[in-house]
Amino acid sequence: MNEQVARKASDTVRPADVVTLAVRERFVSRGGWKLDHALQHFHIKVAGKAAIDLGASTGGFTDCLLQAGAVRVYAIDVGQGQLAWKLRQDPRVGVMERTNARHVTPRHFPEGALPVPLIVVDCSFISLRQILPSAISLLDRAGEIVALIKPQFEAGKAEADRGAGVISDPAVHERVIRELEQFATAELRLLWRGVTQSPLLGPAGNKEFLVHLEKTE
């Protein structure tokens, strides 16, 4: 209050006083809320599991997994220095920077780390078609994948450019999801467990979706 910490519930607040509330965010980034929604929607149990976060960036997905009870998360990102400090210092997090999710293989991981029962994906500027094949090689039999579908990176360049990078046509959303389902089930032999719309829009205002996939063999 008035740039001073109010420590007593009995402190008097006058009409001219300036009151500021300091709200601590639950996750280190908005991505945490997106994954949290998917985990609840698809009834995915995380507690006691090891997981991989492809496209970790600041670490919203990683943070969400840890808060849900993951015992180990390998945070993979092609960039460097983006992961939140609290996650970088967490002994449960394996920081794997400057690692392209498209080309990640079992040799990138320490002995005994693989396979894992759960992989989450939040990648930009690349289609999930180029990420999922690598993810499968890291996944346990009957393991699960939760991936964020970003239509602007799945649709054709002309469609994305037409909306200045924003895909607003529901028909394009439906087509993108349908084509991804066909790819995942027919070519990768994954089970398509379902899809749900993200509770938050992407940075540019794009609608995003989360898909739940399961490995069968």
Could you describe each region identified by the protein language model?
Residues R129-V146:
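A short glycine-rich, Lys/Arg-flanked "PGG" loop and its adjoining helix->strand segment in the class I
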Residues M1-V46:
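S4-like RNA-binding module at protein N-termini
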Residues Y74-Q130:
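S-adenosyl-L-methionine
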Residues V46-S57, L65:
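Conserved class I S-adenosyl-L-methionine
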Residues S57-T62, G79:
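Residues at the N-terminus of the alpha-helix immediately C-terminal to the conserved SAM/SAH-binding loop
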Residues L200-E217:
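Core SAM-dependent methyltransferase catalytic element
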Residues H173-L188:
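Short alpha-helix
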Residues P151-D169:
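Short, glycine-/aromatic-enriched active-site segment of Class I SAM-dependent methyltransferases
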